[in-house]
Amino acid sequence: MNRRDFIKNTAIASAASVAGLSVPSSMLGAQEDWKWDKAVCRFCGTGCGIMIARKDGKIVATKGDPAAPVNRGLNCIKGYFNAKIMYGEDRLVMPLLRMNEKGEFDKKGKFQQVSWQRAFDEMEKQFKKAYNELGVTGIGIFGSGQYTIQEGYAALKLAKAGFRTNNIDPNARHCMASAVVGFMQTFGVDEPSGCYDDIELTDTIITWGANMAEMHPILWSRVSDRKLSNLDKVKVVNLSTFSNRTSNIADIEIIFKPNTDLAIWNYIAREIVYNHPEAMDMKFIKDHCVFATGYADIGYGMRNNPNHPKFKESEKDTVEKENVITLDDEEAASLSYLGVKAGDKFEMKHQGVADKNWEISFEEFKKGLAPYTLEYTAKVAKGDDNESLEDFKKKLQELANLYIEKNRKVVSFWTMGFNQHTRGSWVNEQAYMVHFLLGKQAKPGSGAFSLTGQPSACGTAREVGTFSHRLPADMVVANPKHREISEKIWKVPAKTINPKPGSPYLNIMRDLEDGKIKFAWVQVNNPWQNTANANHWIAAAREMDNFIVVSDCYPGISAKVADLILPSAMIYEKWGAYGNAERRTQHWKQQVLPVGAAMSDTWQILEFAKRFKLKEVWKEQKVDNKLTLPSVLEEAKAMGYSEDDTLFDVLFANKEAKSFNPNDAIAKGFDNTDVKGDERKIQGSDGKEFTGYGFFVQKYLWEEYRKFGLGHGHDLADFDTYHKVRGLRWPVVNGKETQWRFNTKFDYYAKKAAPNSDFAFYGDFNKMLTNGDLIAPKDEKEHSIKNKAKIFFRPFMKAPERPSKEYPFWLATGRVLEHWHSGTMTMRVPELYRAVPEALCYMSEKDGEKLGLNQGDLVWVESRRGKVKARVDMRGRNKPPVGLVYVPWFDENVYINKVTLDATCPLSKQTDFKKCAVKIYKA
């Protein structure tokens, strides 16, 4: 064996052993039997490239892809186990239906294996029952930021062009909706202006509610490298409500009270405007920005009826705050521009127009910042009782100075600490506020950067538009021009698409509870574990009139409360694509056949589409008392369709689709179960052997989808190109990706919009504004702010539920490094399970001593809504201050979302999982 072969074999063996896969001695000398191919990691929004080895129909090893620009050959601990997530002992391999002894569906029955045909028969029956009784609003789809792009696009098309419902919403509503609103309100277009290259180019990394060391560990390795490259110059600051691993290399750690990030941002802005006006980039502001604001009295996204029959008495005092709050000294000071004082009742009069905004003058903007002095902000925000007020003030000053320093490049990163927030959209806007004031946005090494949580929350949920109000490429159902564009691309009649936005994710749950939705289909997520105030939704799922379908790979909580479970193919058992946090789109090929009778979510969507004729769905449909969708059947006939054509025929197996060659050269040497079937000879939804669709369905879906963005600043490359590269950052124009958007040096569309300028914020959403002051708009005449961004003033407001005498602790939830989301996959990897076998209740030693607790004691964590048992950890990786506990949500045996509050940001409808009040006592 020569030196090169020795190194190669050693590397392969090392990668396999890291991933927990044994390497027989025979393999050590014959790795050429392994077939390697590039793919994408299944987990977070970082978008790491990986290499996958397959042998004898199984994935046998994974390793980091050295050619991948995101991770450069590294993986985190989860990434190394991409192979093992696929082969858990309880992998779902056949459809399961609740049935009685006679073989009939029975809501109270036990799960029994059934054929795909029997599963789809019952699914069709129950769907049509709800659809015919309640109309297009009577059904719902829980989608995902973990859909492949093709899966999400197929689901969106079936729902909005087929069923004419907008009740499809992804679990990305839980993670990125506030970021989306922040982008759309500020820039007029979604997704970051910067890219990961900013890490190597910046002088300062400031994390806000983003424990990157655990949640984006590969990006954190790049941050660490940058810090080590120049210890004196490069500064790292970690702002959090509790101490975590991201603080380990931080120059400054700032522990603040929950929700007071709003006040800290306004303090920084005040420092700039009042005390360092020379730091303001006045030319940038004048040429490229306007000042704006909106209403403050917008509620907290809870039900506005505290007397709803499903509420327990203990819940009502919190829910009452949806309509009115009593202002304390601190909140009254922040809202003083509205003429209020401490003790006033503050009514939420603008819940229905939370997203309305208008232009204000710089003088009004400055007036809004007036209360946020260092003294006020430090008093309001200091989160650690062990820290002196003076020390906290010094940290705030140091933080402001880092932003203000004239030639210092600054990147602000955030994730769920910002987004899962009752004012999440506001705090996103505030980050841009400070960066715009300083002219430190959309420049290499400087910018406010929202990090994505899920692997395709950007690529699928946001870009495809699988939200209840959206269409692809930032279009929305409420806009008639956007509907027209979509209907033309989809080749469906005008007025097919429902113009009324549907129910967001949490509201689908509420609608199930209220009987407004009676059929729900869950795809690629676990809503009954991931949604706050879960006791309500468990009861709703088990209501006799409701029918729940869950497509999944393992039996998680959602599957356990379902009526029908469909076994889904996992990531490398199908073709797909993801889009990451830096706008990088990456594709992969099917590597192995699915386990058992599992099939892809795309296949499930298309097979279900076969069950519906146009005359059943494109007829006249009542939406509500104000809106009835017209029949479009005559128009369909004029387009060459028959009313007896199925949605599959029209939407997915049309003439264009069938033009995509199933034997395309790009697919040579790889399986494609959806296109050709496979050796398992699966009995399909019609009871016959499924032999494939006979056309390259994934390529068709991709090429049709990309039509939405071409020429509109969302340009994507063709299907084949992505299989030759390690991803591209859109917009991709003339074969070239874009690193920094809105900057005319780098962005084709910015240059096109403003050829004689340095920047152009060319997004066109909400770019017609009226004028007003801090209180309200003052005229109805709109003016254009084309190519400009908004600098928002948003006040500090407190969370609706805060610690009290009865419930004295804040509760925050989140993730840990070793597990992904609800743990459905990672808890089945033995090595990851052994590393972190249960979710712990992290708390301070002082609180533990006060409660008479020892390390490892079992405690009850109880709120007004529910309680769970968890084991106390006072010495672990997370170190909360006195008065706060942190419990991750990956463990279904520590079902923490029974405890959390279903309050949301009223603009984004994203749940605040970081703030509710609990009591802790020994179990």
Curated annotation (Swiss-Prot):
EC number(s) from the headed UniProt entry: 1.9.6.1
Cofactors (names): [4Fe-4S] cluster; Mo-bis(molybdopterin guanine dinucleotide)
Binding site residues for Mo-bis(molybdopterin guanine dinucleotide): 78, 146, 171, 175, 208-215, 416, 420, 526, 551-552, 574, 601, 813-822, 897, 914
PTM note: Predicted to be exported by the Tat system. The position of the signal peptide cleavage has not been experimentally proven.
GO cellular component, one term: nitrate reductase complex
GO biological process: Mo-molybdopterin cofactor biosynthetic process; nitrate assimilation
Example GO molecular function: 4 iron, 4 sulfur cluster binding
SUPFAM superfamilies, per the entry: ADC-like, Formate dehydrogenase/DMSO reductase, domains 1-3
InterPro entries registered for this protein in UniProt: Asp_de-COase-like_dom_sf, CT_Nitrate-R-NapA-like, MoPterin_dinucl-bd_dom, Mopterin_OxRdtase, Mopterin_OxRdtase_4Fe-4S_dom, MopterinOxRdtase_cofactor_BS, Periplasm_NO3_reductase_lsu, Prok_molybdopt-oxidoreductase
Superkingdom field: Bacteria
Keywords per UniProt: 4Fe-4S, Electron transport, Iron, Iron-sulfur, Metal-binding, Molybdenum, Nitrate assimilation, Oxidoreductase, Periplasm, Signal, Transport
PROSITE patterns xref list: 4FE4S_MOW_BIS_MGD, MOLYBDOPTERIN_PROK_1
Keyword Manganese: no
Pfam families for this protein: Molybdop_Fe4S4, Molybdopterin, Molydop_binding
Family matches, as NCBIfam families: NAPA, PRK13532.1, TAT_signal_seq
Binding partners and assembly: Component of the periplasmic nitrate reductase NapAB complex composed of NapA and NapB.
Protein name listed in UniProt: Periplasmic nitrate reductase
Source organism phylogeny: Bacteria, Pseudomonadati, Campylobacterota, Epsilonproteobacteria, Campylobacterales
Gene name per UniProt: napA
